């Protein structure tokens, strides 16, 4: 099992993000992930904050400060950027990190942000599907060709391409708190792993079973991965029945990890507490030293 942490970049300076990534690597964790917004409309500032560094630029910076740890997006909102711009940025991060990039993708949720960016909110799913196909095509050859509903290109060189072949792993995220049928379908058709956000254990199991069934019916023979993302909330005393997944004592959280690992999950990604950098470091230390050991 690989363990990653999602940095709450809306409340971090670049130096703080660097210190957390370096500490995560020192502790033997496997991945550091960052989220994505371009504009912080009221719904975003209410839930998170207004400070949103560009995720690709931040990951490239962290690549120069780390050696081993994987660097990923959780998640890039695909409609926000031209497909070729996103493909170039992702390929560059994969190059400067020497093949450590994980390309988490989603369709977005804040309609007000789409309005200001002059993007069609109700077409974001279809647009994202087209963009994934276009990005894969851009990465597939030095002079790629693609004809899609929203983007078409050809007759030009695209370089650099990613280090990883055929491309960095594409993790498909979905709306938090419930199994997103469109995201499961998108992953079955176009993704490499399902990256559900904030689901309970039963929903993770049901959603992953649906994903594998859809992929099989579409003729896919490769194994689709599972990489849940949940809040890590470690308590000294057990929370007992009725607790949220991955929240409770070390033993309770470790039991949850063993359950998703038995389903086939190769990754578990955790949102860190938002009570400041020292609390985030303590959570990473407990994850690395206590939870990993207990779940092994």
Where are these regions (language model features)?
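Active-site-adjacent structural elements that line small-molecule/cofactor binding pockets in enzymes
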Residues: 1-296
């Amino acid at each position: 099992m690989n363990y990653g942490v999602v940095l709450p970049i809306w409340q971090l300076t670049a130096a703080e993000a660097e210190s957390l990534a370096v500490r995560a690597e020192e502790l033997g964790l496997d991945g550091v992930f960052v989220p994505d917004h371009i504009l912080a409309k009221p719904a975003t500032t209410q839930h998170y904050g207004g400070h949103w560094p560009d995720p690709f630029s931040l990951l490239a910076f962290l690549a120069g400060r780390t050696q081993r740890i994987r660097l990923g997006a959780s998640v890039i909102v695909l409609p926000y950027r031209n497909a070729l711009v996103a493909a170039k940025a992702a390929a560059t991060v994969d190059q400067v990190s020497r093949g450590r990039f994980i390309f988490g993708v989603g369709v977005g949720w804040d309609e007000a942000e789409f309005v200001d960016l002059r993007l069609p909110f109700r077409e974001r799913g279809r647009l994202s599907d087209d963009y994934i196909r276009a990005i894969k095509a851009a990465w597939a050859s030095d002079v790629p060709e693609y004809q899609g509903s929203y983007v078409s290109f050809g007759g030009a060189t695209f370089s650099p391409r990613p280090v990883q072949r055929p491309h960095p792993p594409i993790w498909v995220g979905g709306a938090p708190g419930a199994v997103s049928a469109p995201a499961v379908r998108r992953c079955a058709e176009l993704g490499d792993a399902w990256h559900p956000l904030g689901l309970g254990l039963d929903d993770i199991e049901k959603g992953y079973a649906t994903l594998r069934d859809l992929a099989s019916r579409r003729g896919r023979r490769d194994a689709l991965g599972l990489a849940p993302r949940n809040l890590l909330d470690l308590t000294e005393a057990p929370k007992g029945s009725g607790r949220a997944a991955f929240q409770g004592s070390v033993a309770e959280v470790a039991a949850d990890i063993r359950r998703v690992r038995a389903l086939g999950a190769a990754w578990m990604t955790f949102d860190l507490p938002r009570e400041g950098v020292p609390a985030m470091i303590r959570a990473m230390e407990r994850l690395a030293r206590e939870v990993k050991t207990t779940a092994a």
